């Protein structure tokens, strides 16, 4: 069967609006986008909402929003329009009915009046007999090689009995195609069921509508998950029934858990929106999913890619057949690299709304104008960039830069406090109050000079100073942290702390 089309590449991502965007869906969308953009082609997003029972209101807009937040902007969609619309399948029902009528007239499809109970009974019987469940063709008309008289079919139609329309799969033929990822693939039509094309509610099935739309929208390459490979015989037969040239197909490897089981929505958070809500950035997520099945090739150690680099370097020939393991540790590492490299102004733009929300919900003893300033936030970012895992942690994990601690790490206090700690701290607070230089270097020099005559090591004060200033026993360089917090804030916190912490 011929599977090549004209020179302009057109790919599509066709999600169902049944919920959030699965990470596997993001990968499919990305690979379609990259393949089209690399050669100057078009990327289309089509909403496949033929299953009205599972349709979630607003999910179509949410899917497109998530894609665009990740940098994947469609050339044609329900948002952007285009010359091949509508891009919502529920708005194309007349088109599907027209092509279904053509298949009926050609004896490539037939009416089926079997009830759900009959179908279930037939399926159970076949399974008991060890036969692969398939429709038993009870309603296949005599004119198509079946046993049902046309008069019986017409009688049911006249009575207004509910029906579906099924395709007639040819008997005992070989169905072959060349998959871009998997190479030659062959099916025996004897294993293929007479697929339902039109449901009793007048809506087409995915299999029928997608073939019609892919042809009418001039899609040249269909890049989708491996789970659709078993549907290929039905799709290729439909192209043949209509006399249409089929696009080229590429079936991507499954996404797997570390234990090699299939990554599933039922196993927890696998929606892109869930990862974004946890603090992962869209560009890091996109980079991560790009590597789930694709690699640049031997000799390349690069793992961090911009979208522009991916467009330049991506090829379906470098997509593997084996399942791709979804390793959350790898995503964490990629996110960390993005935070390290992200310009300060971008981080400030992202975290300012979070800080403003915190300040609106909670009072602070610090100067709000100062801690909200770009200058102050830049200092916090420079100090914490190596320590945070997500952008929002510049606020949440670094809370003590904006609010005085309400509690102190009890384990750290128990470990670091001695009988005379508060007494020595009080003396050092006086030293700090009298100093006009609150730079990190001077604070360090003062501390070392202060403890030496007392026969103590710097650590005697370093840890208590950190705990009383931040509430926790770990963090960035103490001296730089104190400098960023500022003299007024540090002295206030230390005085408050020695009143509250006792051994």
From Swiss-Prot:
It catalyses: tRNA(Glu) + L-glutamate + ATP = L-glutamyl-tRNA(Glu) + AMP + diphosphate. One of its GO terms (biological process) is glutamyl-tRNA aminoacylation. A motif ('KMSKS' region) lies at residues 262-266. It comes from the Bacteria. Keywords: Aminoacyl-tRNA synthetase, ATP-binding, Cytoplasm, Ligase, Nucleotide-binding, Protein biosynthesis. Belongs to the class-I aminoacyl-tRNA synthetase family. Glutamate--tRNA ligase type 1 subfamily. Catalyzes the attachment of glutamate to tRNA(Glu) in a two-step reaction: glutamate is first activated by ATP to form Glu-AMP and then transferred to the acceptor end of tRNA(Glu). Monomer. This is Glutamate--tRNA ligase.
């Amino acid at each position: 069967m011929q599977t090549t089309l004209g020179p302009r590449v057109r790919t599509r991502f066709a999600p169902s609006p049944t919920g959030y965007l699965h990470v596997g869906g993001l990968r499919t969308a990305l690979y379609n986008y990259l393949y089209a953009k690399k050669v100057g082609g078009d990327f289309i997003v089509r909403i496949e909402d033929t299953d009205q029972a599972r349709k979630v209101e607003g999910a179509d807009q949410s899917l497109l929003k998530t894609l665009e937040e990740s940098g994947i902007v469609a050339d044609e969609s329900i948002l952007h329009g285009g010359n091949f619309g509508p891009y919502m399948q529920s708005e194309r029902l007349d088109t599907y009915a027209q092509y279904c009528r053509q298949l009926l007239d050609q004896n490539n499809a037939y009416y089926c009046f079997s009830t759900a109970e009959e179908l279930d009974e037939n399926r159970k019987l076949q399974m008991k007999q060890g036969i692969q469940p398939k429709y038993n063709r009870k309603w296949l008309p005599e004119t198509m090689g079946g046993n049902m008289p046309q008069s019986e079919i017409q009688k049911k139609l006249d009575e207004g009995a509910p029906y579906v329309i099924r395709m007639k799969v040819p008997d005992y033929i070989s169905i072959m195609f060349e998959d871009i990822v998997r190479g030659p693939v062959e099916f025996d039509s004897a294993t293929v069921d007479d697929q339902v094309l039109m449901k009793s509610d007048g809506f087409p099935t995915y299999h029928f509508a997608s073939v019609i739309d892919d042809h009418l929208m001039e899609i040249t390459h269909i890049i989708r998950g491996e789970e659709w490979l078993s549907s290929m015989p039905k799709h290729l037969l439909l192209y043949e029934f209509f006399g249409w040239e089929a696009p080229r197909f590429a079936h991507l490897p499954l996404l797997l858990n570390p234990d090699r089981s299939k990554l599933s929505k039922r196993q927890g958070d696998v929606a892109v929106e869930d990862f974004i809500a946890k603090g992962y950035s869209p560009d890091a997520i996109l980079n991560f999913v790009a590597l789930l099945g694709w690699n640049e090739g031997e000799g390349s150690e690069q793992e961090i890619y911009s979208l522009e680099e991916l467009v330049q370097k991506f090829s379906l020939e470098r997509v593997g057949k084996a399942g791709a393991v979804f390793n959350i540790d790898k995503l964490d590492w990629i996110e960390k690299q993005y935070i390290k490299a992200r310009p300060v102004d971008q981080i400030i733009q992202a975290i300012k709304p979070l800080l403003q929300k915190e300040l609106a919900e909670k009072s602070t003893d610090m100067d709000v104008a100062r801690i909200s300033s770009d200058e102050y936030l830049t200092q916090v970012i420079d100090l914490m960039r190596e320590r945070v895992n997500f952008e929002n942690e510049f606020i949440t994990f670094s809370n003590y830069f904006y609010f005085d601690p309400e509690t102190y790490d009890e384990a750290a206090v128990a470990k670091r406090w001695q009988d005379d700690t508060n007494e020595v701290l009080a003396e050092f607070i006086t030293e700090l109050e009298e100093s006009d230089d609150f730079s990190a270097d001077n604070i360090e020099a003062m501390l070392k000079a202060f403890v030496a005559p007392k026969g103590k090591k710097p650590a005697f004060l370093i840890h208590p100073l950190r705990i009383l200033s931040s509430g926790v026993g770990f963090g960035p360089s103490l001296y730089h942290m104190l400098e960023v917090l500022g003299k007024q804030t540090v002295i206030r916190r230390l005085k408050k702390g020695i009143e509250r912490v006792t051994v």
